[in-house]
Amino acid sequence: MPRSRSLLATLALAVGTLHGGCIAYNDSCQPLVEDPDAVVGYLGHEVFLDKNFTRHDNHALGQLVADAFLHAEDDSTRPAMLGVVNGGSLRQEGLCVTRTSLRKGPLTDGELHELILFENLVVTVDLTEKELVDMMEQSVGALYVEGQSITFPSGAFLHLSSGSSLRVDCSRPRGARVRALTVGGTSVPLPPREDVSIRYRVAMNAYILDGGDGYGAVLGNAGKDPGRNPVQARKLGGTDANITAAYMKSKHPTPVQALMEEQRVVFENCALPARPAGR
């Protein structure tokens, strides 16, 4: 399981039932931050929170988190080239509130911490080119083929940081679905080169790096290998929610600079969730 605030907080995850609106409040809960109503930034459109959206499509919140990871160690001598976050770490059911969507407009610190609930640590580590491509294959391996119903989307699906992109063909077999990959605007050769001296510095949460969502078979002990230079984020306790909130404040502080979803993953022959008219 991902790292959480405490055992008691995890056991307290008694989620309220939806009642035809966007949110339903639990009977009792405690705010996760000192000022839950403080606005940390603005959303440029409605953001849907069902698993079909967070785990099977591009997603504004997932892209925000990946961007925050990318820039978490900008002041280090070896900053990240790519930030990734698994869709399974984005939660619609929080300790206090269950949501189906976030409306366009202001996003509060309390909302953001409910959505990024587990307080995973952010770690930057060197991956070989093969590990990077295999990581992307793990990300898209469980995507449903076009025409299929998305019934149990995998939390392993990765959202990518700005400047990087992925093209995936779901008609191809698992392990051979990645058709194109760029990191920081530079194309990654496919198939990947076997030269282990070629490294990509990637920021991710410790849950993935420790093998969660099936990534152990890809990453092995990379997070514990000094030769991979693993570095935990130093600011704001090093946790994903705090780092993302600070990044949101700096990059999307006004409606004019509102967060917008981008097409960073291009899907070919893949099932996609149906979006309401106008989105």
Each model region followed by its residue ranges:
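Catalytic centers of hydrolytic enzymes
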Residues: I23-R279
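Hydrophobic alpha-helical targeting segments used for export or membrane insertion
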Residues: A9, L13-T17
